[in-house]
Amino acid sequence: MIVGIPKEIKNNENRVSLTPAGAHELVQRGHTVYIQHTAGINSGFSDEEYEKVGARILPTIEDVYAIAEMIIKVKEPIECEYNLVRKSQLVFTYFHFACDKELTEAMMRSGSVCLAYETVTDKQGGLPLLIPMSEVAGRMSTQEGARFLEKPQGGRGILLGGVPGVKPAKVLVLGGGIVGTNAALMAAGLGADVTICDISLPRLRQLSEFMPKNVKTLFSSSHNIEKELPTTDLIIGAVLIPGAKAPHLITRPMLKLMKKGTVLVDVAIDQGGCFETSHPTTHAEPIYEVDGIIHYCVANIPGAVPCTSTLALTNATLPYAIRLADLGWEKACENDPGVKNGLNIVNGKIVFPAVAEAFGWKI
């Protein structure tokens, strides 16, 4: 199969979807790998490293899309890429269709096959291609939240962990999955007073068994969340419904319950966001204020640490990329229902129910 790796062009997206080691694996199996010029440079990989393992370098993104049977990316195609995607071309990446109608319609028009990292499942029903970036995003959400609590960044001027004789900041984490767990552990490690909410009592029991003593668990309800808001300094939204739009757990009227300068970090923004007042931001302009509350809603948080996140991502995606290249998408999906769950759009038709439901469409 001919595999194409375009350079990511989303704002400050520094990851690359295939490392030289991954390219080597594909080339050794008889596949042809084309890499766009400097696609790996921000993750620490030169064109020469790719060429040494048998990959070929192409000068432009148009060249890569034109020749490849399978495109492997990190983030969804953006508007200038829509017309480059071809009929029957397999595109393997994070899509997050449920919060982006324009992208969804563009991929339907293209007639391509869209296989989304975020809905591929394993035998236990887990999300193996979402986990590594959720781990990175969870940890970074605490780091970024702590940064924007600082006075020069517009925050209230609070040190997350406090010091002896001074109380630490209070952190509220909404969602006890991979993102929320990593966010809570990072905040706890810095010494914050942490509360983590979830709607699953079994999950809360699990969390209470291994979380440090400065982490409390709380059943997630509007009433319980509202009670926490007046004393909380940093709120991290880490809600996930696979492939679907995130629910709004904090509404605009609830902002009035918070202290001015409270920081909201919405990690669910790539699925529409779990705060009513959220809209996507970029690493170049990461924050904005609503009613005196700081919102951090960067949709590609791991893109800021590409030397870590590229390796974490490709460790997970490479086995699937190899299977798709070896077998083709139809046979790969036939052999593994988990891969089939990754199919969101096939030849112009939505095949993933949560995406159709997000727009009120029928499959």
What are these regions (language model features)?
Residues 209-291:
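Rossmann-like adenosine-cofactor binding region
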Residues 76, 136, 177-178:
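Residue-level detector of alpha-helix initiation sites
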Residues 69, 75-76, 95-96, 221, ...:
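Short glycine-/small-residue-rich Rossmann-like dinucleotide-binding loops
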Residues 118-144, 148-159, 269, 274-363:
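Adenosine-phosphate binding glycine-rich loop
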Residues 2, 8, 79-169, 298-300:
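Glycine/serine-rich phosphate-binding loop and adjoining beta1-alpha1 elements at the start
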Residues 6-45, 152-240, 287:
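Glycine-rich phosphate/diphosphate-binding loop of Rossmann-like nucleotide-binding domains
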Residues 2-110:
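An N-terminal-biased, well-structured beta-alpha scaffold segment characteristic
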